[in-house]
Regions:
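Feature captures the catalytic ectodomains and active-site-proximal regions of enzymes
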Residues: 1-298
Length: 298
């Protein structure tokens, strides 16, 4: 989402995954909600916020710097932190579409960024091909069809897309069940279950690589930090100063329907077992490709 919010790739913003290790806090932090990844507790440090470390200029500010006559607005779920002065709360697709419709009826030129956390949430819990997912997609398609009809003649360019795809998981393996890999690490892994950053002991690099590839050779693609950066999977541009901190010396990215669950005993005790049926951040086509749908409603 940060690429949408900033107009820049992860390599430049430093926002590369859900949970990143911050040496400033000495722990893995879920960056969007700003909570401890293990306990789920919010950060309570006044003198050092996430935005102080990996802050960025929102696209709204960038637009207003070029043309302050525009009306710049975001439509977001109620739990999302505001990033611009004019923010409309919408917790459903209906509310989001209604907000777009109302704003587009005004005479003032505007830029509107709207986001809904479904179908992502539904797919996580029921899978890509569940009845719940199919029903939501059909209802959403109907709602957008109605929106397009209502926006005709308003000189609106409507773009519909997503921040990632999804892939159903058929095999889950907990880090707790991988002692041969755990013993090679200096600290808990981070980032995502399908894009994992490993900080490996210098004297255990060969053992780690052998252990990982013997178990996951056809399931994850293993990169060194240098190989990942050279691949430009994080995009092109000036490297953020924290990238070197956030990436371990090995990174594994899923290429199959196997997912390694990043958990420790405390996290499992607090949150229970991971129940996601579908997830993302791997290199499968389903996860990498997103649609871009455009309506030019003059």
């Amino acid at each position: 989402m940060t690429t949408y919010y900033s107009g820049k790739p992860p390599i430049e913003t430093g926002w590369i995954a859900w949970s990143q290790y911050f040496k400033e806090y000495g722990k893995n932090i879920d960056v969007f909600p700003e909570v401890d990844d293990t306990t789920g507790e919010p950060l309570k440090i006044k003198d050092m916020k996430i935005s102080d470390i990996i802050g960025y200029k929102p696209i709204y500010s960038q637009i207003l710097e070029k043309n302050d006559d525009l009306m710049v607005c975001e439509i977001m779920p109620s739990y999302v932190k505001k990033k611009t002065a004019l923010t409309i709360t919408a917790d459903t697709i209906d509310e989001m579409c209604k907000g777009i419709e109302n704003l587009c009826q005004t005479e003032k030129q505007s830029f509107i960024f709207a986001y809904c956390d479904n179908p992502d949430g539904i797919i996580h819990h029921t899978g890509c091909y569940s009845n719940e997912t199919k029903e939501f997609i059909k209802e959403t398609e109907n709602r957008f069809t109605n929106l397009v009809e209502k926006l005709k003649g308003t000189n609106t360019l409507l773009l519909i897309s997503a921040d990632h795809g999804h892939h159903d998981t058929k095999e889950k393996i907990s880090m707790l069940d991988l002692p041969e890999i755990q013993e090679c690490l200096t600290m808990p892994p981070s980032l995502e279950s399908r894009m994992i950053s490993f900080n490996v002991k210098e004297n255990k690099k060969d053992k780690f690589k052998q252990a990982f590839e013997s178990r996951f050779k056809d399931k994850y693609k293993l990169f060194t930090k240098e190989e990942l950066l050279q691949s430009h999977l994080l995009g092109y541009g000036k490297e953020h100063r924290k990238i070197d901190d956030f990436l371990g010396n090995f990174i594994a990215i899923a290429i199959s329907d196997t997912t390694i669950i990043l958990e420790n005993y405390l996290r499992r005790e607090i949150h229970g077992e991971d129940r996601k049926i579908s997830t993302h951040c791997g290199l499968t086509q389903d996860e990498m490709e997103v649609p871009i749908i455009m309506f030019d409603l003059k």
